[in-house]
Regions:
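Basic- and aromatic-lined ligand-binding clefts that recognize polyanionic substrates
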Residues: 25-39, 133-186
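A short, structured surface patch at a secondary-structure boundary
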Residues: 27-91, 95, 191-194
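His/Asp/Glu-enriched short active-site or ligand-binding loop at hydrolase and phosphoryl-transfer sites
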Residues: 52, 176-198, 245
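Flexible loop/hinge segments that line or gate small-molecule binding clefts
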Residues: 56, 95-124
């Protein structure tokens, strides 16, 4: 084989590999609601063929439901012939093993513990779906917004903040979580910063005298919780009318866009009652 023909063969082979890589994940199943949301943010929803019963945007598009939050219907998944199934640490190891036994590629995304991890996962997903440039642009925009927001709040005294994400039992957002970063990025001090577990008593919260109380929306219970806290009139958060309800669908979802939207909302709330 002469040199010219060899170069041509190499070029054809390389092109085939690239085309194969580009078409690798044309049929995607997501068993992670936040990943499903990110697929929509990346405008790659046309590749999504299956989702969980908690994947709101996909349900609206009538995508095939193949799982609950923790239990997958493997038979249904196999019938959809996916190129890849994206799972989380909540997905049953048995289900993952069964899918792999059927020759299905399974990619696991761990639960993001920080905004940086959220960003890394978004870019990793972008690479999988040939949307890396778009993903990196979104992350750059989100980080620029954080930088801008950090300049809008200035405190004379660092405020103590309680962020509640459960009512029965009362559950506090901890440090070293992506939701804990809402508090640090607001320039506040988390009253639960020294705790190892999130379950707290009402007495504990009262003893910490928070300046702000944020409660994630939990239907009627969030409104009831706000009313309950308002009975404790000695609390600084009550005295200064600083009890706020935050959209749980955004605050609890580890995606870069919902993270920024929540931070913007909380910053606005703080500025109103500074």
């Amino acid at each position: 084989m002469n040199r010219k023909r060899l170069i041509m063969v190499v070029c054809i082979f390389t092109t085939c590999l690239l085309l194969s890589a580009q078409k690798r994940y044309q049929r995607v199943i997501s068993l992670v609601p936040s990943i499903t949301q990110n697929i929509y943010y990346l405008k790659a929803e046309s590749r999504l063929v299956g989702c969980t019963s908690y994947c709101t945007p996909a349900l609206a598009d009538k995508k095939e439901v193949v799982a609950t939050a923790i239990e997958a219907n493997v038979e249904k998944i196999v019938l959809l012939k996916p190129d890849v199934v994206i799972v989380s640490t909540l997905t049953s190891p048995k289900d993952i093993a069964t899918m792999r036994k059927f020759g299905i590629e399974v990619v696991e995304f761990a639960s993001a513990k920080s905004f940086e991890e959220i960003c890394s996962q978004y870019i990793a997903l972008g690479k999988m779906l040939e949307k890396q440039t778009e993903a990196e642009k979104t992350i750059d925009e989100c980080k620029a917004k954080i930088k801008k927001l950090s300049k809008t709040l200035r405190w004379n005294v660092v405020p103590k903040i309680f962020f509640q994400i459960g009512a029965d039992p009362i559950f506090a957002v901890l440090d070293n979580t992506f939701m804990g970063e809402y508090i640090s990025m607001l320039g506040g001090k988390n009253i639960a910063s020294k705790l190892e577990h999130g379950i707290v008593s009402r007495e504990f919260v009262i003893s910490q005298a928070p300046d702000f109380i944020f409660i994630t929306s939990m239907g009627i219970s969030s409104e009831e919780e706000a009313k309950t806290w308002k009975r404790y009139t000695t609390l600084p958060a009550v005295k200064n009318n600083r009890i706020f309800i935050v959209d749980a669908n955004k605050a609890c979802q580890p995606t870069p866009i919902t993270f920024i939207e929540t931070l913007e909302e909380m910053t606005k709330m703080c500025k109103q009652r500074r």
